[in-house]
């Protein structure tokens, strides 16, 4: 598990990546595949598991550290 501040940064980065690459959270949830409620929870409450962040980084083809950068 990671610190709350970092998990919130990861959730915000996920929101940005979805916005840049998909027309909606629903479209991303279908493509990933992930339950829409889980996508919403990650965006609003953060991502607490490092392996989940790593999987998302690989999916979006961005470096793992990109989930913790402030933009």
Task: Set out the residue ranges of the language-model regions.
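Recognition helix of helix-turn-helix/homeodomain-like DNA-binding domains
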Residues: 33-48
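Short C-terminal boundary/hinge segments that cap the last helix of small helical domains
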Residues: 61-71
């Amino acid at each position: 598990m990671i610190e709350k501040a970092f998990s919130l940064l990861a959730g915000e980065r996920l929101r940005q990546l979805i916005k840049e690459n998909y027309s909606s959270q629903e479209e991303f949830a279908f493509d990933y595949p992930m339950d829409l409620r889980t996508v919403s929870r990650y965006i609003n409450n953060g991502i607490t598991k490092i392996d989940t962040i790593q999987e998302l980084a690989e999916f979006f083809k961005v470096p793992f550290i990109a989930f913790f950068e402030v933009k």
